[in-house]
Regions:
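N-terminal glycine-/serine-/threonine-rich phosphate-binding loop
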Residues: 1-9, 30-42
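Solvent-exposed alpha-helices and their adjacent loops that cap or buttress functional pockets
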Residues: 2-3, 85, 131-136
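Structural motif
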Residues: 9-12, 143
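Short glycine-enriched, charge-decorated loop/helix-capping segments at active-site entrances
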Residues: 23-29
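Ligand-binding beta-strand-loop-alpha-helix segment within the catalytic cores
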Residues: 46-115
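Glycine-rich, aromatic-bearing surface loops/beta-hairpins
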Residues: 91, 95-159
Length: 159
């Protein structure tokens, strides 16, 4: 199903993996800026809210626009992501969004994982894999997902 305007797109990205290093070892601000620009272009085109996952040092908190947090009732946390505590893409997002804030948890409708950063904790309950024609960005493996409402009921239920 096509994304709907107002939905949330979560992205986790290891720029270390993108440039061919192990996750968390060699972040790249240059790669982060290029990736963020591409993500912003796509999310703007489709009217989606972008949420960028920080690294495990910030408990995988997320950088997003204050407007998204207000709409979805996400609670803000007090932290400023930087390259070595949050990740390069999170730092770029924080410095680039109109009104950037950091939140601890969300339930996104769609997701893209660049470099196996493990975004599953921020997706809605029923996750459906999306097969992409492009399997990598640089040296980083791409994994994409969408979500759907859970099916409830038993043998009498109609969907």
């Amino acid at each position: 199903a096509a994304p709907k305007p107002g939905q949330v797109f979560v992205v986790g990205c290891s720029t270390s993996e993108v440039i061919g290093s192990l996750i968390g070892t060699a972040g790249s601000m240059e790669a982060a800026q290029s990736i963020f620009a591409a993500l912003l272009k796509v999310t703007s085109k489709h009217g989606l809210y972008l949420a960028v996952q920080c690294c495990e040092h910030l408990n995988r908190s997320l950088v997003t626009e204050a407007e998204a947090a207000e709409k979805y009732c996400w609670e803000e946390v007090a932290v400023k992501p930087v390259a070595h505590a949050g990740g390069s893409l999170a730092q770029v997002a924080y410095n680039s969004f109109r009104q950037a804030i950091v939140v601890e948890k969300i339930s996104a409708h769609l997701g893209l994982d660049i470099g196996q950063t493990l975004i599953g904790m921020h997706l809605r309950r029923v996750v459906v894999p999306v097969r992409l024609s492009q399997k990598e960005i640089g040296a980083a493996v791409l994994t994409a997902a969408r979500t759907r409402p859970p099916y409830v009921g038993g043998e009498r239920a109609v969907y």
